[in-house]
Regions:
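Helix-loop segments that flank and shape redox-cofactor active sites
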Residues: 29-42, 59-88, 185, 216
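Extended, basic/helix-rich recognition subdomains
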Residues: 235, 239-281
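Alpha-helical bundle segments that constitute or directly flank the non-heme di-iron/ferroxidase center
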Residues: 19-24, 39-69, 96, 194-205
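Short alpha-helical hairpin
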Residues: 15-39, 263-272
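Acidic, low-complexity proline/glycine-rich segments
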Residues: 2-31, 246-253
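Amphipathic, well-ordered alpha-helical segments in soluble domains
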Residues: 26, 54-61, 100-103, 169, ...
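Active-site-proximal alpha-helical scaffolds that flank and shape metal-associated catalytic sites
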Residues: 80-250, 294
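A cross-kingdom marker for long, charged
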Residues: 264-272, 277, 283-303
Length: 303
């Protein structure tokens, strides 16, 4: 019999709540094609170009979440406040994602891949210009809308439009009231933190699945990466980077922070009061979780 003191995990609850949708977001045919060396350079280039724009939205959202965090005024006596830990994680994420963009550029140059939307292969020079909406993947448009509301619920994406199915729903889910969360809301940063954890966890699991498929192919003695349709960019460079133990530790660190913070809110509550608090938290995040998974699923190009 489970102990009555067993800690409830919000992140594990979310992962198990939408299993089929999560699977479709992390085990897509695009990933399998990449793992098997069948992904053409033009399709990989399109995805990389969109993922680079995702990085830019991620950076803006991280800044918004940092600005919204109310850091403690008192010096901690033991463990640092969850808000301080979250700020540390976001700062670490910003450093990592800038390194990631430089990695994109380096690999794209070495494998002759395009990382600018509308430009299939690296040009000698290109002037900065606005990206045509129709060239963005549906998942990127949804993620830009999701990120626009992080840490600032009254804000909606200036790029939103009824032309793209689901964007209005995304904005309504990730936008609460014009005044933002109530000052008495438990963990007012929770939705923003879960957005970052959710997108990073999907990325980790997606590329870890691709790595497992690539290893199956390698163990069967099939062709070397140099003969892959993308020249080996995914199997030699990207897949190992995005399925590393270091990346897994980084993602797990935020998941643990979230679960520990929620456990702190539930601590001392029993019976109906504890269950009501759980339901209040789930009411804030479950719809957003599903919407995030839909965006992640639609971020992969058709192959």
């Amino acid at each position: 019999m489970a102990s009555s003191r067993e800690t409830w995990s919000l992140t594990q609850h979310l992962l198990s709540s939408q299993e089929q949708l999560y699977k479709s977001a992390t085990q897509h045919p695009f990933l399998l094609a990449g793992a098997e060396g069948r992904l053409p350079k033009d399709i990989l280039s399109r995805w990389l170009a969109n993922d680079r724009l995702y990085i830019h939205s991620y950076i803006r959202a991280a800044g918004q979440l940092l600005a919204s965090i109310d850091l403690p005024k008192q010096v901690p006596r033991s463990q640092e406040a969850f808000e301080t830990q979250l700020a540390d994680w976001i700062i670490e994420a910003l450093v990592a994602i800038r390194k990631e963009e430089r990695f994109f550029i380096d690999v794209a140059e070495r494998y002759n891949l395009g990382i600018e939307i509308g430009l299939p292969f690296p040009p000698a020079a290109a002037a900065a210009q606005d990206v045509p909406r129709e060239e963005k993947l549906p998942g990127l448009i949804q993620m830009e809308s999701i990120f626009s509301a992080v840490g600032n619920p009254s804000r909606t994406s200036s790029d939103s439009s009824s032309k793209v199915p689901g964007v209005a729903l995304v904005q309504s889910l990730f936008t609460t009231t014009a005044a933002g969360p109530s000052p008495t809301t438990n963990l007012p940063w929770l939705e923003g933190a879960l957005t970052f954890w959710g997108t990073e966890r999907c990325y980790l699991d997606a590329w870890s699945w691709a790595r497992a498929k690539a290893e199956e192919r390698r163990s069967s003695g099939e062709q070397a990466e140099e003969n892959d349709a993308d020249g080996g960019a995914l199997r030699k460079e990207f897949i190992p980077n995005w399925s590393s133990s270091e990346f897994a530790h980084f993602v797990d660190k935020l998941g643990k922070l979230i679960d520990d913070a929620v456990a702190g809110v539930l601590e001392g509550k029993e019976g109906e009061a504890k269950e009501q608090t759980k339901q209040d938290i789930l009411g804030r995040v479950e719809g957003k979780w599903r919407t995030l998974l839909e965006a992640e699923r639609q971020f992969w190009p058709d192959v």
